[in-house]
Structure formats: C-alpha cells, structure tokens
C-alpha cells in the first residue's frame, strides 16, 4: 500500500510559486501512466521555455563567448541528468501521480520522469502567470549552475566527449541504434544502444526523443570507460 501524497501546497512552497489554477500543477505532476490528462504537453512547453531562459542568461553573462560554447553550457545546465538532480532535490517523486506499473517499478525515482516533471512545472507556471514570472523562477532554481559555469570543454555534451575520448584512444567512433520505441508518435519513449569497439555489451539509454536517448547512452559509455581507464 502506497503512502498518501503530501498536499500540492507543500510543493508550491518548494518551487517558490503559488498557483491560481491548481489544476495546472496537478496536471504537471501526473504521469501518462496515471491519466489521459497527463503532463507531456506541459513538458513540451516547459522544455522550450527553459532553453530560452537559460540561453538568454548565458548570452548576457558571457558577451564575448562564441555560439558553440554557449550551446554547450546551455546543454550542460538543461540536460536530463541536471533536471533530474533538481527534481530529486525538490522531492518531486513524493508528489507524482503514477500508474500502478510505474509505481511498482520505482518510477518516482526514475531520472527521466523527474526531469520531465521539472519541465512540466515550468510549462504550468508559465501558463498560470507570464514570461517574467517564470523567468525569475527558473533563474532562482538554476542560480548555482549559472554562477559556477564557465566556457570550456567540460561543457561539451556526452556524445561529443565520448567521440573525443575514443579518438584520443585511437578507436573507431561509437555507433548508435534505436532498439525500441514505445508510445504514440507524439509522446514516444526511445531506447538507444551505443556500441563501442572492444566492449561486448552495448550501453543503453532512454529518453523522450532519439537525441536524449543517445545522450543518455553516451553518458553510460563515458562513465564505464572513465572508470576502467
């Protein structure tokens, strides 16, 4: 028997925003496994808003930095792992509405679900307020990352870093293959294998787009190669 979820008013305190339309927050915390009124459209909206706000903040902070470094810094800040870390810090798993299958498999701890919930909250706050309000909320959430981040190779995305690591070791480039897709065309979940020469089993990654799944698989490969170096 699952424990009752805390009231969403507690979540409002955590995220730093009080909703006029409580239904938006409820929808943002509802996974597609739990209801047909789920958070994926809000996630889509929040993803775009988050990217814009972080891009604008980096553009203003680094007036002389080239586009490539700006893109890499933005990718590092808004990547799935970064969003999942924020979602865990907020305790979003305690507030999520999940179907029985996801509950049994520990979906409230899954990084992809937590990251999607963060983006859905952003979309919900935007619809409940305006661009200025959500901009300030996002800047408050990501203030530590925006303060510490600097241009450089450490901000390159996982696929780029994996490619450079393999090239440095004089190995062929990795190969990415989509091995499974779930869901309908507008809300699919992708599973990708990343194959590296000399390693028998491919590295798996999942995500709501092929690109996200490839980055997740590349991250798994990087971690293995760095640990075994």
Curated annotation (Swiss-Prot):
Annotated DRBM domain residues: 157-227
PROSITE patterns: DS_RBD, RNASE_3_1, RNASE_3_2
Highest rank taxon of the organism: Bacteria
GO biological process terms, semicolon-separated: mRNA processing; regulation of gene expression; rRNA processing; tRNA processing
Active site: 47, 119
Binding site for Mg(2+): 43, 116, 119
A GO MF label: metal ion binding
Catalyzed reaction equations: Endonucleolytic cleavage to 5'-phosphomonoester
HAMAP family xrefs: RNase_III (MF_00104)
Protein name: Ribonuclease 3
Organism: Idiomarina loihiensis (strain ATCC BAA-735 / DSM 15497 / L2-TR)
Record gene name: rnc
